[in-house]
Amino acid sequence: MNQRLSALVNGGYLSENEANKLMHDMMSGSLTDAEVAASLSILAHRGETAEEMTGFVKAMRQNAAPMEQSFDVVDTCGTGGDGLSTFNISTAAAIVASAAGAKIAKHGNRSVSSKSGSADVLECLGIHIQSTPEETRRQIQEKNMGFLFAPLYHSSMKQVAVVRKQLGFRTVFNLLGPLCHPMQAKKQIIGVYSKEKAKLMAKALAPLEPEHVLFVCGEDGLDELTITANSYVIELKKDVMTEYTLNPEDFGLEKGSLSDIQVQSPEESAKLIQNILNHQTEGAPLHITALNAGAALYVGGKSESLMAGTLKALETIKNGAAKEQLARLKQKTKEEEIYA
């Protein structure tokens, strides 16, 4: 039996280095499916430690496809798994934030458990998702936004894909994705499905020297800054961690209903996003997009506060800049035409 797995079976905890080695073993295919399943099951049952998570993140980053780092980009990504079937809020927010001047490197994938993954809805919107690393960097430079399709950068994840699907419950990999940005983005909005996991992820990321990151979780269970209830926030800025609660009404936004932001398909999500960007939708869909886009502008240094960022996001939608940005993102380059 793998010695790291043996430690877990016997009730032990892994050091950062041991966790790093265990993840390398998983990513390299050195473990049997049974050993992978046992490791993931034990961790899920007893809960991962922050030290273990840091070791896992380092290993995942080391196994990712090489891409030039950029500390200026912002990612809006979440763990998913909240089971609430909302439209792709972080994707809509990314488009608005990029229209307002933030450099967005959106990391995402197809749907696993939700009605619509970020890759699914971007395709429905007519935006190319499988660009090369070079083309993605060019898109970020020229259009303020590029999409990093997770399977292109984390191909070693295929070693555990079958086991994860067979297990059918959340594992540590649900938490690792947002912490393993291919460009090692130092500025992020990370949505988490529970307050406890948000704390764990923040503690795990802190040793990796993030510049400005918000971990957000709605009291309604949404892995976003929500509009139907208060939101819990952990803010990491350099080496300072603060925790607070946000009430959307403090931003001048009326609390809405969850049903107003739920969808049944990527196509329905894309339609709602188009209506938001065209400023043809008011209420909860508009407000939750502006709130999360405002957060991206805040961590990206384009606004001095969450409040200022939210107001800037609303104005970006109302003045037509967000609509124009969507049209710009849909325009294919010569390289994208070749790979389409």
For every predicted segment, state its role.
Residues 40, 87-143:
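A glycine-rich phosphate/pyrophosphate-binding beta-strand-loop-alpha-helix module
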Residues 8-54, 61-69, 288:
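N-terminal glycine-rich anion-binding loops that anchor highly charged ligand groups
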Residues 7, 62-65, 86, 101, ...:
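Glycine-rich anion-binding loops and their surrounding alpha/beta cores
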Residues 38, 92-96, 288, 292-295:
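Short amphipathic alpha-helical face segments that pack within enzyme cores
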Residues 15, 32-33, 49, 90, ...:
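Helix N-cap / loop-to-helix initiation motif
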Residues 47-112:
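Active-site cofactor/substrate anionic-group-binding motifs, chiefly glycine-
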Residues 2, 19, 36, 53, ...:
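A general structural signal for well-ordered alpha-helical segments in protein cores
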Residues 1-15, 76-84:
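N-terminal basic/disordered segments at the start of proteins
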